[in-house]
Swiss-Prot record:
Required for the activation of AURKA at the onset of mitosis. Interacts with AURKA. The keyword DNA-binding does not apply. One of its GO terms (molecular function) is protein kinase binding. The keyword Isomerase does not apply. The modification Phosphoserine is found at S191, S250, S305, S311. Phosphorylated by AURKA. This is Protein aurora borealis. Residues 114-146, 505-525 are annotated as: Disordered.
């Protein structure tokens, strides 16, 4: 350390007033490193030998300047005349070109078909000549034909005219469209999740029509017969498919039901409500054990759910044992539990509103209890409720989101009506002259009525009205209140009336009025 301090003290300051000379390659901090040892490259003092240059030669330009050469103009003229005469000589040029052609026309190189070789005209070879010579041979053996060559215009085996109809000749032997249409793999991969325009047998059309200008295409006729088909049912008298109807609804006397789970449109303020129609066995079992039969709770069947045709007959006497359940969950508007606890109705109470005064609307079908004394009041309240449910729609969504669901019960009867019965309360819904086809699949559902249908696709949350007359199944907001179960059955009647529905402009729907000889008590479940 002492040596370093001594070296720093020996640095003399610069003379004041003199312009300091600064080395741009040095920094002010280099002074502190002068005492350190400098490491030089090992080859810094190594002598390098330069390569010995070769023999020196002057360039052409330098030689022309140093020693110019005199050229005789006569020699220049002589060389020019020689070159000119050699170019004009055609005989020599022809000999050269002939030698070139002979070289390229030998067997080593393939000759061009457009050129004549050895001055011989090649004969043309046609398939017809070969066939005729084969037929004319007496012993039936193929005659040995001499090796012949064809020119460039005859190198095809078959020539067809411009207006030749190849499909008319080969169309009966191969039809690619029919082969692709009947392949099971192509049926499953032809669309996202459904096959379009299929009948009950799974084919595009029952007969395969011959292509003719007057006959419409199969897809056009299939679109007129029904809606989209997801899983057609085979080996049935009437061709039904889940989500499509291939026959006229007017020709069907009894409505057809299948297990289905409908779900109302969800909004951020919506919450599920229950609308339950109990059967004697199901209500007793649920009340005693609190556990619902899994076969009743789950309407979904693996694969394809068959659609059963129920022979209708009218109810007689008291409650009867019910054979099947149809669950229709509804999601109604959101209200607080305090408001729901205060709502109770007697007599005309099913038409009453909540504390806010807004009727709860699910669809355009209204199920009401009318008496001779209060029928006019109930209809007046319904007319007021129509103005408030103009913007209310029901969209089908994925049924797995539904927590609280409702059950509808059906039972075969004798006549042309298909009632859905509440055996505990004796309520019978009798819907006449209407055809209802409900699909259990979540992909699509069709509710046709009088040659009209409405399709709701749950995958994309869309709703499509197909015609002007739709059959919409639902209930008003007051349907969240269940009818009090009594031991005395009360007969009810459902009357179908056609009124204007505000779901889609210009479309009509069916309103269901429920009449009873006396009002019944309603309360929250």
């Amino acid at each position: 350390m002492g040596d370093v301090s001594e070296l720093k003290m020996q640095i003399t300051p610069e003379t004041p007033g003199r312009i300091p000379v600064l080395n741009p390659f040095e920094s002010p901090s280099d002074y502190s490193n002068l005492h350190e040892q400098t490491l030089a490259s090992p080859s810094i003092f190594k002598s390098t030998k330069l390569p010995t240059p070769g023999k020196f030669r002057w360039s052409i330009d330098q030689l022309a300047i140093i020693n110019p050469v005199e050229i005789d103009p006569e020699e220049i003229h002589r060389q020019a005349s020689y070159l000119r005469l050699s170019r004009i000589d055609k005989d020599v040029e022809d000999k050269r070109q002939k030698a070139i052609e002979e070289f390229f026309t030998k067997d080593v190189i393939v000759p061009s078909p457009w050129t004549d070789h050895d001055g011989k005209q090649p004969s043309e070879l046609h398939p017809s000549k070969c066939l005729s010579s084969h037929d004319d041979s007496p012993d039936g053996k193929k005659p040995s034909l001499p090796s012949q060559k064809c020119n460039a215009a005859c190198q095809t085996l078959l020539s067809l005219p411009v207006d030749f109809n190849l499909e008319a000749i080969l169309g009966d032997y191969f039809r690619e469209e029919d082969f692709v249409a009947h392949t099971p793999g192509n049926l499953s991969s032809s669309s996202l999740r459904r096959k379009l325009f299929l009948d009950g047998n799974g084919s595009i059309c029952d007969p395969l029509p011959s292509p003719s200008p007057g006959s419409p295409p199969c897809s056009a006729r299939g679109s007129l017969e029904g809606q989209f088909s997801s899983s057609p049912i085979q080996n049935s008298v009437k061709k039904y498919s889940l989500g499509s109807v291939t026959t006229s609804p007017s020709a069907i006397s009894s409505p057809t039901f299948s297990p289905i789970a409908l779900q109302g449109g969800k909004t951020p303020l919506s919450e599920p409500r229950k609308l339950t129609f109990h059967s004697p066995e199901a209500s007793c079992a649920t009340a005693s054990t609190g556990i619902v039969n899994p076969s009743i709770r789950s309407p979904y069947i693996d694969g394809c759910s068959p659609i059963k045709n129920w022979s209708p007959r009218r109810l007689r006497g008291g409650p009867q044992c019910l054979s099947s359940l149809v669950r229709i969950p509804f999601t109604l508007e959101a209200h607080s539990e305090d408001e729901e606890a205060d709502v109770s109705c007697t007599g005309a109470a099913p038409l009453s509103t909540n504390a806010c005064g807004e009727p709860r609307v699910v669809t355009a079908m209204s199920v009401t209890q009318s008496h001779s004394g209060i029928a006019e009041k109930e209809r007046a309240v319904l007319d007021d409720a129509e103005s408030e449910r103009e913007n209310d729609t029901v969209d089908m969504v994925d049924p797995t989101d539904t927590v609280a669901e409702s059950t509808w019960i059906k039972e075969p009867v004798d006549d042309g009506n298909s009632p859905m019965t509440d055996s505990a309360s004796g309520i019978a819904f009798s819907i006449e002259n209407s055809h209802m086809c409900m699909s259990p699949l979540a992909e699509s559902s069709v509710l046709p009525y009088e040659s009209s249908a409405i399709q709701m696709n749950s995958d994309y949350n869309t709703q499509t009205c197909v015609s002007n007359i739709t059959d919409i199944v639902g209930t008003e907001r007051y349907c969240k209140e269940n009818v009090t179960h009594t031991n005395v059955p009360v007969p009810f009647e459902v009357e179908m009336k056609s009124q204007v529905n505000n779901v889609t402009p210009g479309h009509t729907a069916q309103r269901c009025w429920m009449k009873s000889p006396r009002p019944s008590q309603c309360s929250r479940p």
